[in-house]
C-alpha cells in the first residue's frame, strides 16, 4: 500500500496535515530528519507510516512509559502490530515481546532511552532488521532544553553500535536555535532533512490574568468549563493540594498529581483522569508529558512556570484534537520569587562543573525574564510566544486576552506619584490591597485600625476604581519602580528608579487597557448535543469494556463528524474522520444503530 492508502486504512484520514507528507517522503527515501511540529500536529504519523511502508521493525525512543502504553494501545486498536518494552512488564512479558520481535510480528517497538544501554537489547536489535529509529521528545538531549535527560545522550552511542545504521528521525514540539543545534549534533543526524511546520496552535486561546484573588478566578474558569476535562498546574506540591482541596470544597471533584505521591496513587489518578472518571486534575509539572489525552478543553497555570518552553508544552496539552480550548495563566509577582528560589536551589546538575552550572543558571534567569515578559505583555500573547521560538509575526492574532483588550498610551506620571507617595507616607509596610484602599478612600476596618485615613494620600485617587489602581501598581512593579517583598504577605517598597518620577524630573507613559477584555465564548463545531452525548456514552462503554481510554476508541472530533454526517451504513461510516478499516469493522455496528434511531426520532 502507498502512504495515502495506509493513512486511510489505519488512521482514517483522507489527507495529510501540514508537513506530514514531506517528512514521510524524506524518511522513506532513507534520509535522516529533524522535525519541529506543534503538539497535536501529528508527529507520530510521520514515523508510523514509513514504518508500515518498510521491511523490519521501527524502534521508537520515548521518554515516558505512560505515553508508550497509550500509543501502542492506539496502534493496536487501529490494527497495527506494535509493542513496548519497559520496566512495567514482568520478565515473562518482556521475553514474550522480544520473542515476537525476533519473529517479525511487530512493525514498531517503543522503548525508553535507558533500555538502549542494556546489552541484551543491543543484541536483539542486531539480530533483526531495523527499518528506522524515531526519537520522540528530542529536546530532552539538550542541556538548554526544558527537560534535559542524561539518558538521551546515550542514543547516538547505541546507534553507532548497530551493525547496520538505519535512518534516524528526531521529533519535538519546542526547540530554540540552541536546542536545535544540540539535537543535530548529539543525536548524530547525518545530512538531515529539517522542517519546522510552525509552532502556532490556532485552536488555543491564550490569556494572562492578574486577579487579586486567584482562587475566585479559578472557580470562574472551572465553572465556565463545567463537565469538561481540564488541567490546573501549580508550582509547588503544597499549592497542588491547597488548590485541589479548594475545588473539592466548592463542588468540583479534582485529583492531584505530584512527585511526593506514591507511584500507585499517581498512576491511579492519571488513569482516572485519562479515562474520564474525573474531569479535573491539579498537578505540578511532573504531570502531562506522557499524556496523549486529546480532549483537554482548558489548562490553567495557577502559578507562572519557569520558562516559555515549559509553558507552551504544558499549555499545549489542551486541544490536541484541534477543537477550541483555553490556556489561562494566573500571574502574580510572587510567582517570580518562587521560580528564582528554584533556580538558586537547583541540584539536578550536581554532576556538572561549577562553570557549567553557572552557565545554566544564567540561561535559566534569561528564560525566566522572557517568561515574565509574557505575563506582563500588553501586546499579542501568541506573537510573543511564536517570536520567542523564532517564528516572527506582526499581525495580531485576535485570539488572546491582549488582543481582546483595547489599549491606549497614557501619561501616568501624576497617578504614579500619588501611588509612590502613598507607599512612602505609610512607612513602606503595606501590600497592594491596603495601598489601593488608602488611595481610593476606603472606609474598611483596617484603614481605621491603622489610622491610615489620617494620611495625606488618603482618598487622593477616589475618582478611580480599585481595579484601576491595582493595575497601575502592578505595572509599576513590572517596570521596577516598586518592588515586592518575598514574605507571606508581600509588602510594597519604592526603588531608586522611582525617585526621578517622585521629584518630577521624569514623566511616565504606559499602554493601559481602556476597554476590558471582551468575553470569548467557547466554540465547537455545531452538533446536536443529544446525539453527541449518546455517542459519548457508547464510546465510554466500549472503552471500559476494552480497558482503554475513551479517546483510543474515537476522539471527540470523530464523534462530532458522526453527528454532522449521520452515517447509516458501513461505507458511510468509513468516511468519518478517524475511522479506518479496522475501526469500521469493529465499531460501525456499535454506533450506526444509535445514529439510525436518532434520525428516525428527529426526522
Predicted feature descriptions by range:
Residues 27, 222, 273, 375, ...:
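Short helix-to-turn junction characteristic of helix-turn-helix DNA-binding domains
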Amino acid at each position: 500500500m502507498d502512504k495515502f492508502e495506509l493513512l486511510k486504512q489505519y488512521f482514517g484520514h483522507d489527507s495529510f496535515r501540514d508537513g506530514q507528507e514531506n517528512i514521510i517522503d524524506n524518511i522513506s527515501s532513507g534520509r535522516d530528519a529533524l522535525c519541529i511540529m506543534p503538539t497535536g500536529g501529528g508527529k507520530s504519523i510521520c514515523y508510523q507510516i514509513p514504518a508500515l511502508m518498510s521491511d523490519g521493525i521501527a524502534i521508537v525512543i520515548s521518554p515516558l512509559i505512560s505515553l508508550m502504553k497509550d500509543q501502542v494501545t492506539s496502534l493496536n486498536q487501529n490494527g497495527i502490530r506494535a509493542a513496548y518494552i519497559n520496566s512495567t512488564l514482568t520478565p515473562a512479558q518482556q521475553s514474550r515481546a522480544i520473542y515476537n520481535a525476533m519473529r517479525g510480528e511487530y512493525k514498531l517497538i517503543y522503548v525508553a532511552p535507558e533500555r538502549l544501554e542494556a546489552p541484551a537489547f543491543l543484541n536483539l536489535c542486531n539480530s533483526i532488521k531495523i527499518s528506522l529509529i524515531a526519537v520522540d521528545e528530542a529536546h530532552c538531549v539538550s542541556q538548554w532544553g526544558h527537560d534535559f535527560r542524561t539518558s538521551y545522550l546515550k542514543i547516538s552511542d547505541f546507534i553507532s553500535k548497530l551493525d547496520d545504521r538505519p535512518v534516524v528521525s528526531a521529533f519535538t514540539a519546542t526547540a530554540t536555535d540552541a536546542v536545535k543545534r544540540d539535537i543535530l549534533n548529539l543525536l548524530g543526524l547525518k545530512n538531515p532533512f529539517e522542517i519546522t511546520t510552525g509552532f502556532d496552535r490556532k485552536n488555543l486561546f491564550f490569556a494572562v490574568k492578574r486577579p487579586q484573588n486567584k482562587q475566585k478566578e479559578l472557580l470562574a474558569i472551572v465553572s465556565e468549563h463545567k463537565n469538561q476535562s481540564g488541567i490546573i498546574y501549580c508550582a509547588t506540591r503544597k499549592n497542588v493540594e491547597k488548590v485541589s482541596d479548594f475545588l473539592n470544597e466548592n463542588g468540583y471533584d479534582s485529583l492531584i498529581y505530584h512527585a511526593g505521591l506514591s507511584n500507585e496513587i499517581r498512576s491511579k489518578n492519571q488513569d482516572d483522569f485519562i479515562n474520564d472518571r474525573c474531569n479535573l486534575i491539579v498537578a505540578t509539572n511532573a504531570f502531562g508529558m506522557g499524556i496523549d489525552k486529546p480532549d483537554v478543553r482548558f489548562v490553567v497555570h495557577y502559578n507562572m512556570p519557569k520558562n516559555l518552553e515549559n509553558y507552551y508544552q504544558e499549555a499545549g496539552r489542551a486541544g490536541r484534537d484541534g477543537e477550541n480550548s483555553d490556556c489561562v495563566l494566573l500571574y502574580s509577582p510572587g510567582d517570580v520569587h518562587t521560580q528564582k528560589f528554584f533556580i538558586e536551589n537547583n541540584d539536578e546538575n550536581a554532576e556538572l562543573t561549577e562553570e557549567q552550572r553557572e552557565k545554566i543558571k544564567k540561561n535559566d534567569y534569561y528564560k525566566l525574564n522572557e517568561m515574565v515578559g509574557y505575563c506582563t505583555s500588553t501586546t499579542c500573547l501568541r506573537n510573543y510566544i511564536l517570536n520567542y521560538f523564532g517564528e516572527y509575526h506582526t499581525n495580531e492574532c485576535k485570539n488572546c486576552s491582549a488582543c481582546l483588550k483595547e489599549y491606549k498610551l497614557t501619561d501616568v506620571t501624576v497617578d504614579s506619584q500619588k501611588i509612590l507617595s502613598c507607599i512612602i507616607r505609610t512607612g513602606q509596610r503595606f501590600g497592594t490591597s491596603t495601598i489601593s484602599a488608602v488611595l481610593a478612600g476606603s472606609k474598611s476596618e483596617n484603614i481605621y485600625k491603622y489610622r491610615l485615613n489620617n494620611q495625606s494620600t488618603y482618598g487622593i485617587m477616589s475618582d478611580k476604581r480599585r481595579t484601576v489602581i491595582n493595575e497601575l501598581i502592578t505595572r509599576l512593579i513590572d517596570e521596577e519602580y516598586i518592588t515586592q517583598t518575598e514574605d507571606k504577605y508581600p509588602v510594597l517598597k519604592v526603588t531608586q528608579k522611582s525617585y526621578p518620577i517622585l521629584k518630577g524630573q521624569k514623566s511616565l507613559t504606559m499602554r493601559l487597557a481602556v476597554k476590558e477584555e471582551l468575553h470569548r465564548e467557547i466554540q465547537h463545531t455545531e452538533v446536536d448535543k443529544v446525539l453527541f452525548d449518546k455517542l459519548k456514552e457508547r464510546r465510554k462503554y466500549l472503552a471500559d469494556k476494552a480497558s482503554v481510554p475513551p479517546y483510543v476508541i474515537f476522539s471527540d472530533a470523530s464523534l462530532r463528524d458522526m453527528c454532522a454526517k449521520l452515517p447509516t451504513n458501513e461505507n458511510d461510516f468509513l468516511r468519518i474522520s478517524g475511522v479506518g478499516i479496522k475501526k469500521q469493522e469493529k465499531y460501525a455496528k456499535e454506533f450506526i444503530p444509535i445514529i439510525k434511531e436518532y434520525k428516525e426520532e428527529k426526522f
